[in-house]
Design a protein with these regions (language model features):
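Short gly/pro/ser/thr-enriched loop/turn and capping motifs at secondary-structure boundaries
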Residues: 61-64, 118-121, 136, 250, ...
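Active-site cofactor/cluster-binding pocket
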Residues: 2-236, 240-242
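Metallocofactor- and cofactor-centric catalytic cores in central/energy metabolism, strongly enriched
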Residues: 13-15, 53, 72, 76, ...
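Thiamine diphosphate
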Residues: 13, 20-102, 240, 247-352, ...
Length: 622
């Protein structure tokens, strides 16, 4: 076993005298399938209940059980909830990774470890705490088969005592976690209390990190992005969901099933929705298109491999002009890639998904709140413009826990777009399905079952004229494609506008100085790293930046204006090939493209502020 400056008696010396309050990253290293998820959630929630802003990130393997898992809790008094690169307090429960985990820490960090691991001989610039977990759990859990699961709750109690997390909040979190299982709650509470008592009696506090009560989480909730998206889709009026299970999107539909069963049952006791597990992703999007053609609000959820399989039907929906919503919870590719790691690698593929000339609307949420609100926006846009709308989430947002204000009840009415009724057809005497009467590229449609002889039309993915009749005439094809492009251009005025933060006052879209020469463009969950990085750049290097967060494609006028106003614009994204930057170049005047710079992050971990700060400051010559 390699060593680094062996510590006398493994005590960690006199480290940690500086008191660091409500600013730390706690990492729990365990084995997948060991029951640590409940313990980690309890620890996260206990800190949250003490009024301290938190976020939780689960780094787990793509197997059922047995491989290493890391769960990171960030607590930050200033409200930074992006990933912190440095680990301040390590709970080492996995013998396989313990040595590497310890050796990767910065000096001054604390390590809580299972006594048999003997980690305190590795380094003398860390604070070590040894705990006999098996001995402690045996005193509170008579059933040996349960000890493996309850053992994790012991470290919750130990951490609570060492960081001064109130045990009353730990109990509340346990009661909430096991709300329907009183016996399990009592057993886990006993384990946590035993850990707390052991730490109080046997461990001398030497670390620097503390949790103290604040008042920055009052009225807030903790929820993952997939659950927020499922709730948003239900409120948006979605009635047909078709899917094929794939990580990390499966939990979106699984949660939606539970919501719909509870809230979308009619007075007669029958479901007012249909959720179908298809045989594959191609079948799933085919059902979405069929339901959308029939007038239902329909959707599917998938990830990159599913997006690839959906390509042919995506082209059909684009060309035949049928509405539908697709949630892409992005993960690392290509191919199978890293199924349980996060990415923003589907941007280019999705924007032009299918062969031929296609362009798709993309909405890009950065928060659980936007997962909820963009669901309604996606369905409205899909029906208004009779096309697919892709909501580009990612694993970090979809599967991790985020702090948020409660969602506001939707008040925006459902927008069905240009749908002709029997009465409309009576007045018109007929209609041409793909004729651009209003100059916006959007034709009028009818729904199956409309009782009028002029209502029917033939839906096809082959060449057609404005009356939907089959045609191979060059002018019909060219006119149709130009109209589709005109429709896409019209959407620029309807998609969510970007969020712009200027100058020193990052909280106001109208604040700041016009003299700032450096701009940053980012999107999705990269936002949380950028918020923190801008403060680091200002405080450490004197670099002032303006920031634009993209929320949709196609780009609006504000995006062009932002680039024009800055000498250098850094496009930060979580993929190798600068995919969003490539989209921007296609959209910009050639002379503006030279202002763009790329900062790429592609290791599968959520973007952290320090990585952005280091790279941007270096590129600026600092």
């Amino acid at each position: 076993m390699a060593t680094m400056d062996v510590a006398p008696q493994g005590t960690g010396g006199q480290l940690g005298r500086k008191r660091i309050v409500n600013d730390m990253s706690i990492q729990v290293a365990t084995v997948n399938g060991s029951g640590s998820q409940s313990s980690n959630t309890v620890l996260l929630r206990a800190i949250f209940q003490m009024g301290v802003p938190v976020s939780g990130k689960n780094l787990f393997p793509s197997n059922i059980a047995g491989l290493p898992t890391w769960y990171t809790i960030r607590a930050n008094k200033d409200g930074y909830i992006g990933r912190k690169k440095e680990i301040d307090f390590l709970v080492a429960m996995n013998a396989e990774t313990a040595q590497d985990d310890v050796m990767s820490l910065d000096a001054g960090a604390s390590v809580l470890y299972d006594e048999p691991l003997g980690l305190d001989k590795l380094r003398n610039d860390l604070v070590f705490y040894s705990v006999p977990y098996d001995k402690i759990v045996a005193t509170v859990c008579p059933e040996a088969k349960l000890r493996k699961l309850v053992k994790n709750m012991v470290y919750v109690g130990v951490v609570a005592q060492l960081l001064e997390i109130e045990m009353g909040e730990v109990e509340k979190a346990i009661r909430k976690q096991f709300a329907t299982k009183v016996k399990a709650a009592n057993l886990n509470l006993a384990a946590a209390q035993a850990g707390f008592d052991h730490a109080k009696a046997n461990l001398q506090k030497r670390g620097a990190f503390y949790i103290e009560r604040m008042n920055k989480t009052a009225g807030k909730i903790i929820i993952d992005g997939n659950s927020a998206a499922a709730l948003g889709c239900m409120f948006a009026g979605c009635t047909v969901v078709t899917w094929y299970p794939i990580t990390p999107s499966s939990s979106l539909v699984e949660t939606m099933i539970e919501y719909m069963k509870e809230y979308r049952i009619g007075p007669d006791g029958k479901a007012t929705f249909a959720i179908v597990q298809a045989e594959d992703e191609l079948a799933a999007i085919g059902m979405v298109i069929g339901a959308g053609w029939a007038g239902a609000r329909s959707m599917t959820a998938t990830a990159g491999p599913g997006i690839s399989l959906m390509s042919e039907f995506a082209g059909l929906a684009y060309y035949a002009e049928i509405p539908g919503v697709i949630w892409d919870i992005q993960r690392v590719g290509p191919s199978t890639g890293l199924p349980t790691r996060t990415s923003q690698g589907d941007i280019l593929a999705t924007a032009f998904l299918s062969h031929g000339d296609t362009k798709h609307i993309m909405l890009i949420p950065c928060s659980v709140t936007e997962c909820f609100t963009m669901a309604s926006e996606a369905f409205n846009l899909a029906e208004q413009f009779q096309t697919l709308v892709f909501v580009m989430s990612d694993l970090d947002l979809g599967m991790n826990n985020w702090m948020s204000d409660p969602f506001e009840y939707p008040t925006t009415p459902i927008k069905r777009g240009k749908v002709l009724t029997k009465e409309d057809l009576e007045k018109l005497g007929g209609f041409a399905r793909y004729k651009d009467l209003d100059g916006d590229g959007v034709g009028y449609r009818t729904l199956p079952g409309t009782e009028h002889p002029a209502a029917a039309y033939f839906t096809r993915g082959s060449g057609h004229n404005d009356k939907s009749s089959y045609s191979e005439r060059p002018d019909d094809y060219e006119n149709n494609m130009e109209r589709l492009n005109r429709k896409f251009e019209t959407t620029r005025s309807f998609v969510p506008r970007p969020e712009i933060m200027k100058g020193a006052n990052a909280g106001s879209s109208n604040a700041g100085s016009s003299n700032v020469k450096i701009g940053i463009i980012a999107y999705g969950t990269s936002h949380w790293g950028i918020i923190e990085s801008r403060d680091q750049l200002r405080n450490e290097y004197g670099i002032e930046t303006d920031y634009l967060r993209l929320r949709a494609y196609p780009f609006t006028r504000e995006v062009h204006d932002f680039i024009e106003q800055h000498d250098r614009v850094y496009v930060v994204e979580q993929n190798r090939d600068a995919q969003m930057l490539s989209l921007l170049k296609l959209d910009l005047k050639p002379e503006l493209t030279t202002r763009l710079r790329s900062i790429s992050h592609l290791d599968g971990l959520p973007l952290d502020a320090r990585s952005v700060t280091d790279e941007l400051s270096t590129m600026e010559g600092k």
